[in-house]
Amino acid sequence: MAPIKVRYIVDDVDATIAFYTQHLDFIVKAHPAPGFAVLQRGDLNLLVNAKNGQGGAAQAMPDGRKPEPGGWNRIQIEVDDLGGFVETLRKAGLRFRNDIVTGFGGKQILLDDPAGNPIELFEPPSK
């Protein structure tokens, strides 16, 4: 079975690499060009493309729209202690879209990467 891949469009590939490797335990699997990198965490490969890059992911659609960062679709990273993890990230100056919310399935918060792409940090309920 092929690995899971998700593509994010970003403003700055190097800033994105630093963010994901320093704060979320991703590793750099490949960085073959300034406008593209593959980051890995477990079974997830995160493909990051510069919004103005030369590759196909940055090309305009037939109607003229161009890919851009942001939106609401996101990856989810499960953590054991959401409150403690969020506190560490806040001290590092990272941006969150909201505060921790608790629902039937657990606790979550939305963290923005440097380009404004969301990452859901999630803590399941205690068993």
Place the predicted regions along the sequence by residue:
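Conserved active-site tyrosine of GNAT-family acetyltransferases
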Residues: 16, 20-23, 89, 116
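Short glycine-/small-residue motifs
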Residues: 118-121
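Vicinal oxygen chelate
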Residues: 1-5, 27-78, 84-112, 123-127
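Catalytic core of Fe(II)/2-oxoglutarate
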Residues: 9
